[in-house]
């Protein structure tokens, strides 16, 4: 009986030790980057207010094509401003807090996308 208890205790300790090596639940994501194409042309922007699901820690790539320079405002913590020139640029961001992040053009007074971070 003592031998059984000793073996059971050793197995229980080993399992507890192994579970401590698991995922810490951080904000990293193994998901592929979320690609969002943003086009500014003739005073208009697309997309226009779409809601897009994003995982915490997932890379989000904004591919911005514009016919003139401008700025995108990202209402995250901390807030971010993405300045772009005429032509095409790529901006890579990650969000580690759950919630809705609005991405907008202040010049056009328009929400481009709402990122649903979960």
Predicted regions and their residues:
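A short beta-strand motif characteristic of beta-propeller blades
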Residues: 80-82
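Extracellular/periplasmic metallocenter environments
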Residues: 23-25, 85-118
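C-terminal motif of bacterial Sec signal peptides marking the signal peptidase cleavage site
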Residues: 17-20
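Bacterial N-terminal signal peptides that target proteins for export
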Residues: 1-8
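N-terminal edge beta-strand
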Residues: 30-56
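Beta-strand cores of secreted/periplasmic/IMS beta-sandwich domains, seen most often
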Residues: 50-68, 90-97, 101-104
């Amino acid at each position: 009986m003592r031998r059984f208890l000793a073996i059971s205790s050793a197995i229980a300790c080993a399992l507890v030790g192994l579970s401590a090596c698991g995922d810490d639940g951080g904000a990293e994501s193994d998901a592929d980057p979320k690609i969002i194409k943003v086009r500014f042309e003739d005073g208009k922007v697309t997309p226009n207010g779409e809601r897009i699901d994003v995982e915490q820690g997932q890379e989000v790539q904004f591919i911005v094509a514009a016919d003139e320079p401008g700025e995108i405002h990202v209402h995250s913590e901390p807030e971010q401003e993405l300045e772009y020139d005429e032509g095409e640029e790529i901006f890579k961001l990650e969000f580690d807090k759950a919630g809705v992040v609005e991405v907008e053009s202040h010049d056009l007074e328009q929400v481009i996308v709402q990122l649903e971070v979960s």
